[in-house]
Amino acid sequence: MIYIPKKIRYRKHHRGRLKGVASKGNNLFFASCGLQALESSWITSQQMEAARRACTRKVKRHGKLFMRFFPDKPVTYRSAETRMGSGKGTPRDWVAVIKPGKILYELKGIPEPLARKALKLASAKLPLKTKFIFKKE
């Protein structure tokens, strides 16, 4: 499943810079354990889905997985060997801009050792360093 916004205001965005830390979405909200980003990066919708699948396969569809980010930024590409000029390329991918401290995934209703293994599998599919965080209740 590819994640794409239903409606967007502008078809093409500036690329922007990855700086600063996450001010929102940096605390566990839905569950007691989660995966937190340690560096900034773009995560594509394909990477999101691969990580989600790896995690749900490990826990055998028990518990509940919460994804705390969504790819809402279009990334454009020019075809290879194209001359300079003639406008910006067409949007091809959708990415989520991730900053350090952002909670990516949360797992609920699963024992901590199994959740740790599942989220480690998910982190292997992502292009950034992450850490497992656990909230004692």
From Swiss-Prot:
Subunit text: Part of the 50S ribosomal subunit.
Name of the gene: rpl16
Source domain of life: Eukaryota
Family annotation (CDD domains): Ribosomal_L16_L10e
A GO-annotated cellular component: plastid
Entry annotated with the keyword Magnesium: no
Molecular function GO labels: rRNA binding; structural constituent of ribosome
Organism: Helicosporidium sp. subsp. Simulium jonesii
UniProt key word Glycoprotein: no
InterPro entries: Ribosomal_uL16, Ribosomal_uL16_bact-type, Ribosomal_uL16_CS, Ribosomal_uL16_dom, Ribosomal_uL16_sf
Protein name: Large ribosomal subunit protein uL16c
Family affiliation: Belongs to the universal ribosomal protein uL16 family.
